Amino acid sequence: MKYLPDGSDIFSKAEINRFQQFPKNRPDLYIRTPDGKEAIVVLVDDKPLYIILKRLDEIITHSEDEGWDNDSYPHICFILKDHAAKYSFLYATYKKLESMGLEEGELPILAAALGSFDKPIISPWSSPLKPKEYTKLFA
């Protein structure tokens, strides 16, 4: 994948299914870079927003209740069907994080539109705090 550092490992849902550190409803992909940065990726190209937000709630609950093997929880990434779905998700996520009192960077959540991965841009990812700006997965 051109947006990842060389030497990064990408694991599918089937590969991570045997590990206990992941949420019960496993993400579709798990990414680990050579320098130890991590991300879990959820593909939701055909789901309504309320289902996507429920999935996010499950991951946030897992991050708070069970945590991760090391101190920092992986980046939480959602790939959505188009830009409209991405912006709706990011807006709803911003409101959720704000109501929870989470600080910027405390639980990194990013979203991308599926079609963005085919475009010649630096990165397809955006954050709830700056939905119109693109940011690298691992800054």
Role assignments for model-derived ranges:
Residues 1-139:
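Electrostatic, structured charged patches in enzyme active sites and in nucleic-acid/phosphate-binding
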